[in-house]
């Protein structure tokens, strides 16, 4: 396992304060605001420690209420909303400086068999047909001041191969879609809880940025303001992030200063393992 991946997994293992209260450290990615994927993943990690052991996370819905500060830890307060025979619903409040910055609901289910069908994975090419995203980020890093250049050029916990590379500081006009192959940068434990938290973390990277593609904008371009409003994930099938997965994202709408993006995550053999959806603020001022 790479050091950077080991650090991320450690970040997602929270300190237990009492039965329903947990503390997580924050990750500095070069921005003052804490990364939303970190908050969702840590909130799910907290919920998993409270949910009954025989139940598996199958969906979560997060509302981001205020920006988090990447220089301070976050407290996660878990509440059980309902405990049924087969399902458990939990709510997690992410708290920083006594303010709730994110509200996450998560549902867990006892595994069972039932009807099966799924969408077909789009035929967009193999991972080796796509460009290594880190190559573009390292080139961008050369043009940035410290400490941002160091963060952009740093090793990442995921290997990512992306179809459309959009410079975050100088966007180009692209289709309202994105296809990204990804896997962990190093061997990952097969523990389903770790796998689901890692997927939740990664799923926040490309979603809402796809809504900028038709408008020739990068998310760090002068005059742009981009912020996630809500983020949802449905976990369908077991998966192993040690192998390549495809996140196929489409933005079907932008209106009123908001953009919407919907994604499907497939294993390389075509199994639909998760669905994602995100709405965010996308505002541009001259």
Curated annotation (Swiss-Prot):
The keyword Iron-sulfur does not apply. It catalyses: a fatty acyl-CoA + H2O = a fatty acid + CoA + H(+). Thioesterase that has relatively broad substrate specificity, hydrolyzing primarily medium- and long-chain acyl-CoA substrates to free fatty acids and CoA. This is Acyl-CoA thioesterase 2. It holds the Pfam family Acyl_CoA_thio. Homotetramer. NCBIfam families: tesB (TIGR00189). The gene is tesB. One of its GO terms (molecular function) is fatty acyl-CoA hydrolase activity. GO terms for cellular component: cytosol. Belongs to the C/M/P thioester hydrolase family. Keywords: Hydrolase, Lipid metabolism. Its EC number is 3.1.2.20. CDD domains: Thioesterase_II_repeat1 (cd03444), Thioesterase_II_repeat2 (cd03445). The active site is at residues 204, 228, 278. It comes from Haemophilus influenzae (strain ATCC 51907 / DSM 11121 / KW20 / Rd). One of its GO terms (biological process) is fatty acid catabolic process.
């Amino acid at each position: 396992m790479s050091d950077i991946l080991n650090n991320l997994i450690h970040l997602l293992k929270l300190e237990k304060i009492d039965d329903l209260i947990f503390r997580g450290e924050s990750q500095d990615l070069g921005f003052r605001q804490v990364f939303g994927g970190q908050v969702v993943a840590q909130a799910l990690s907290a919920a998993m420690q409270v949910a009954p052991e025989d139940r598996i996370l199958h969906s979560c819905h997060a509302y981001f209420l205020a920006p988090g500060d990447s220089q301070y830890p976050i407290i996660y307060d878990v509440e059980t909303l309902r405990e049924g025979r087969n399902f458990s619903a939990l709510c997690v409040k992410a708290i920083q400086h006594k303010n709730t910055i994110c509200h996450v609901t998560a549902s867990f289910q006892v595994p069972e068999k039932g009807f099966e069908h799924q969408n077909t994975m789009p035929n967009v090419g193999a991972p080796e047909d796509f460009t290594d995203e880190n190559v573009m980020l390292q080139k961008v890093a050369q043009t940035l001041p410290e400490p941002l250049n160091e963060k952009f050029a740093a090793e990442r916990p995921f290997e990512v191969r992306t179809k459309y590379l959009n410079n975050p500081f100088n966007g180009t006009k692209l289709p309202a879609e994105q296809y990204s192959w990804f896997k962990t940068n190093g061997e990952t434990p097969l523990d389903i809880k770790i796998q689901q938290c890692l997927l939740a973390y990664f799923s926040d990277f490309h979603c809402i940025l796809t809504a900028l593609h038709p408008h020739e904008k990068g998310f760090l371009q002068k005059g742009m303001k981009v912020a996630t409003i809500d983020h949802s994930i449905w976990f369908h099938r077991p998966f192993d992030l040690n192998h390549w997965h495809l996140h196929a994202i489409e933005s079907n709408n932008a209106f009123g200063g908001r953009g919407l993006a919907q994604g499907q995550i497939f294993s390389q053999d075509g199994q639909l393992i998760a669905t994602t959806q995100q709405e965010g603020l996308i505002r541009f001022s001259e």
